[in-house]
Amino acid sequence: RGNGRINAKEAREIAEQKRQRVGLKPEISELFPSELSGGMQKRVGLARAIASNPEIIFFDEPTTGLDPIMAGVINELIREIVVEMGVTAITITHDMASARAIGDKIAMIHNGIIQWNGQITDLEKSNDPYLIQFLNGSSNGPIKLTS
């Protein structure tokens, strides 16, 4: 899993396989990052993340900057790949739609402390005031905003 050296030909073959897996057309290989749309950039990032067949994949705000439709497409792609590869995914996100779409377990961290954790299906059942405030997007509650 990603700890051996490969030659240039093998690297190109892997890049081609991963490009196809994330649904990008061959022409994309000739473009600079600045020439790609936000959704294409996210797909390229995902292809790079899976190129070495990792056991764990970290996602940091995977849908930031995307419209809701493209965010849904990226969420579905992440979920498919995680299941297909049988890997562990750790995702940092403020996007609860994304968290619900790709997560099985979730933890809410506030001021560096795990405030709540559990199954994604238990989110709405929680009585934790921090979680309730966050889910509702309320300014009232234990989470105080600082300027």
PLM regions with names:
Residues 99-101:
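A short, surface-exposed alpha-helical micro-motif characterized by mixed small hydrophobic
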Residues 53:
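Conserved catalytic motifs of ABC-family nucleotide-binding domains
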Residues 9-27:
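Conserved ABC ATPase "signature" region
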Residues 72-85:
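Helical segment within the ABC ATPase nucleotide-binding domain
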Residues 57-60:
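Catalytic Walker B motif of ABC-type/P-loop ATPase nucleotide-binding domains
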Residues 32-36, 40:
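Conserved ABC ATPase signature
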